[in-house]
Amino acid sequence: MKSRLLSALLVLTLVTGATGALAATKGPRLYILDCGDIRPMDPTLFGLKKEEIAGDGSFVTPCYLVVHRKGTLIWDVGQVPDAQIPGDGTEVVVQDLLKARRKLVPQIEALGYHVSDIDFLAMSHYHLDHTANANLFAGSTWIVQQAEYDAMFGAREFAIRDSSSYDKLKDSKRITLKDADHDVFGDGTVVIKTAPGHTPGHQMLFLRLKNFGPLLLEGDLYHLPEERTLDRVPTFDFDAAMTRATRVKTEAFLKKTGAQMWIQHDPPTNAQLKKAPDYYD
């Protein structure tokens, strides 16, 4: 009897091992992962003058893992493919601009998850500093705006696009949205929000965290805080008027919900935040 009980417990452990941490969560958890840095860029690209910005024009590029009791979602997947990163701490620089020292997948695995455990993939937009490892998640359900899908795979050429990083998604399982929001797990705690302008189908991620409170990850709606305070739009946005309209709606949404907004690329913002294995819940 004792040996049967031990065998049963062993089987249960093997079956639930990958999902044990997920099942134990009472609300969503947000893990911030290190997906590199971007060398200083000319602030005029963002509608700003050098003397108008506080920093040197450099950026950070985080990735995010959301763990919900009903599943997992990866938000943005880096700027340098894991295959190009040695993984020994050596810095890799792509296009003399995008830097990375750490692979994405080992960071996920360190939290107890494998690529096959990621139920949903969502990226803010198709720019190459957000899509580098997208093909690794071709087995996940991809949440994308129709306009973004068309920009990614259509005949029209778009700047800052590297289709080789996401070409396996073309025929993958997906939830395609038509300029619409999407409640990922059906309880209002993890919501994809449409936010066009920077790209045709740019989107953001809204979270209702039990302890931290409501939070908005804004993709590239802003890159620098000064874009927000001085009302400047990057010169390379797909549609500046659309960006401005999205910003107005977003500011109203923040006021209505009381949500914090993290500017994903902003180094000072990122420096203050807890990184995986710590999390926000």
Model-found features: residue ranges?
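Short, conserved loop/helix-junction motifs that constitute active-site signature segments
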Residues: 136-138
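Active-site metal-binding loops of divalent metal-dependent hydrolases
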Residues: 35-36, 77-80, 126, 147, ...
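Cap/insert and terminal regions of metallo-dependent hydrolase folds
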Residues: 25, 94-106, 206, 211-281
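Bacterial N-terminal signal peptides
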Residues: 7-17
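Positively charged n-region of N-terminal signal peptides that target proteins for export
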Residues: 1-4
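Metallo-beta-lactamase
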Residues: 20-129, 145-194, 212-219, 242-258, ...
